Amino acid sequence: MPRKGPVPKRQILPDPVYGSQLATKFMNRLMYDGKKSVSENIFYQALEFLGDKTQEDPIKAFEKAVENVKPHVEVKSRRVGGATYQVPVEVRPDRQVSLAIRWLINFARSRGEKGMVARLSGEFLDAYNKRGGAVKKKEDTHRMAEANKAFAHYRW
């Protein structure tokens, strides 16, 4: 931790097509080896497909998909005495977004379709309709927190 106070958050520029900071964050997480143009192409094509399927503005559908994947509570390990407890804690808004993006990308990469555009658009569509791997991960996280509610008094 720095001695001179908290490190300021970097300003994220909105993407050129939709003017969305969330889209920029997503493309940056999707990128491999600094190849931003490749990640942009994949993302925009996936959004185009999502817009066609949902008959809605693509960026609004994407934002709804991310909203459906955001976790509100998670568990953190806390050692008390000799035992380790899974303590439920609320998730900060910035962490909610980063977890949702991470889960969407990971589950899209593990899908069976051919090509990343098809995988990503399929995962977006599933998340938009509240199903799919990323939404299941969110529900599992919430279930874990619910099951360990008895240890909530160990919060720090």
Swiss-Prot record:
InterPro entries per UniProt: Ribosomal_uS7, Ribosomal_uS7_bac/org-type, Ribosomal_uS7_CS, Ribosomal_uS7_dom, Ribosomal_uS7_dom_sf
Origin superkingdom: Bacteria
Keywords (A to Z) from UniProt: Ribonucleoprotein, Ribosomal protein, RNA-binding, rRNA-binding, tRNA-binding
The keyword Ribosomal protein appears for this protein: yes
Name the record gives this protein: Small ribosomal subunit protein uS7
Molecular function (Gene Ontology), one example: rRNA binding
Signal peptide: none
Species per Swiss-Prot/TrEMBL record: Maridesulfovibrio salexigens (strain ATCC 14822 / DSM 2638 / NCIMB 8403 / VKM B-1763) (Desulfovibrio salexigens)
NCBIfam families reported in the protein's UniProt record: rpsG_bact (TIGR01029)
Subunit structure: Part of the 30S ribosomal subunit. Contacts proteins S9 and S11.
Entry similarity comment: Belongs to the universal ribosomal protein uS7 family.
An example Gene Ontology biological process: translation
Pfam families for this protein: Ribosomal_S7
GO CC, alphabetical: small ribosomal subunit
Function: One of the primary rRNA binding proteins, it binds directly to 16S rRNA where it nucleates assembly of the head domain of the 30S subunit. Is located at the subunit interface close to the decoding center, probably blocks exit of the E-site tRNA.
